[in-house]
């Protein structure tokens, strides 16, 4: 597996729906609190002890995508996280927490927030899903409101042609 070494930081508020307005040095707990999902909010300290303040290991074991803290708060910070949750569900075979489903079934509130995200970033997430399993991705998108698919595919979607070998 991959090991990621980063400086711990504490984020300020997110007024643009993408990046924090300010960043300052922080503790490991500050850094883990700003993560999107519990399975991404674990660390190992210098004595090889697992730091898991949001029960990410349990969610990993149960194959569940759950937000650190409030899903609404995490997705307001960066709306692309909604699509990341969908991608992890599709590519990793994880279920989604009820709070995330509530957001997916509230498209009139959440779909407009995708407008702050570049179409390129949206397409990157969708391409990763489609590359993993096209049918499952399309089935998933069909299962949620058409408002989502309209927003996701508003600029169209270019896929590389594929050829089945016989």
Regions found by a protein language model. Give the residues of each.
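Catalytic cores of the polymerase beta-like nucleotidyltransferase superfamily
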Residues: 1-166
């Amino acid at each position: 597996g991959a090991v990621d070494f980063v400086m711990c930081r504490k984020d300020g508020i997110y007024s643009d729906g993408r990046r924090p307005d300010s960043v300052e040095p922080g503790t490991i707990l500050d850094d883990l609190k700003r993560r999107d999902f519990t399975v991404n909010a674990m660390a190992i300290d210098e004595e090889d002890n697992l730091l898991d303040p949001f029960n990410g290991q349990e969610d990993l074991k149960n194959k569940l995508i759950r937000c650190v803290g409030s899903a609404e708060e995490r997705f307001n910070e960066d709306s692309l996280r909604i699509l990341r949750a969908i991608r992890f569900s599709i590519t990793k075979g994880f279920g989604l927490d009820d709070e995330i489903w509530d957001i997916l079934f509230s498209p009139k509130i959440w779909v407009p927030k995708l407008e702050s995200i570049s179409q390129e970033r949206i397409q990157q997430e969708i391409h990763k899903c489609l590359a993993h399993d096209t049918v499952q991705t399309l089935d998933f998108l069909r299962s949620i409101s058409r408002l989502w698919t309209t927003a996701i595919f508003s600029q169209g979607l270019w896929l590389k042609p594929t050829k089945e070998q016989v």
